[in-house]
Amino acid sequence: MRWEKGTEFADAILHRSLEENRFSTLDRALFMEIFYGVIRYGRTLDFLIGKLREQEADTRTRQALRMGVYQLLRTRIPRHAAVNETVNTAGRSRAVVNAVLRRYVREEKELMQSLEAAPVGVRLSHPEILVSRWTRQFGIEDTTRLCEWNNEPADILIRVNELKVSVGELMKAGGGEPVAFHPLMLKMEKLPIPWIVTGLCYVQDPSTLMACEMLAPRPGDRVLDACAAPGGKTSYLAQGMKNEGRIVACDVSAERLGRLRENLERLGVTNVEVRKADWLRAPPGQKELGKFDRILLDAPCSNTGVIRRRVDVRWRLKEEDFLRLPDAQMGLIKNVAGLLKPGGALVYSTCSIEPEENDEVVRRAAREAPELKFVKSRRTLPFRDKVDGAFAALFTRA
């Protein structure tokens, strides 16, 4: 499996696989379910396979076993069909895969009892590094709830683009259920493709709007969105500014800037200037960009608040990431702070729930960027707020 090599993200691999293979609608949905499911439940699957077969399997055999056990554990596919279809894809490992999966069917009750008695990380398929740090931070009950949340399919949530349409108009046109967390959000049964294509809405979690509302840009302001791609927050800032004033939207990746431009054009955003910028290695200066009334710094982070949507994140994180990332985040704050006008506002935000990237960075900013005055912060926690995990802190410049 290409994902296991660690060089590509799961979403990119899936997208390419779907382009390379002509699936029917049903087969496409099943392929996606198994692909994401095997990654999401990898630790649980390996635990069950270990109960059925002590001998270590090669990569191809292990993947076939994971796909088969996942179907037996998490889908409604008939037992015989799940076994037979998996065996047919196993090549030279057919005999081993057939034997292990048939044993699973025979011993399922005992296997489920063993799984129920297993530690949280095994039962809910999370690495020990995350389970341990969350247990220290939240306690075992909330950690269990967080792991359960991360394993649930993400709801389809859209933010209504008021530059083009009102919430009421969209609800009359095709339904959607209001979301209590935010008045511009609707929960959909399925992706509203025509609305997305015509820019009437943008798919995003309501927690992503928190930082923008804390920044509170006004029509006519000059705003810097320092790490802007793919544009969900940028477009919401423009919406709040009624397309008046100016937003300079930056990103380090040319590919991501392309997506940013496409999204802004589709959403009818006209007050944004898109620029490539590396805020760590070669930060643009005041001569190049000028000064800003408002700065949004949505910093690269561990993504531990969005594991439900980014299924491979849990397996990629290492302890050193929680040492490395805060240094980079603090570097970003210091490099953009000089572009803020006196009396201006800067919001630092992440989609992490880790204190090293959030409150501790805020405390560091008081020491390392004394020109910034901390005003307030807010965070969302999935197990408490029923939205993605996020953090935002507001600073002003004296």
At which residue positions do the language-model features occur?
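S-adenosylmethionine
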Residues: 1-398
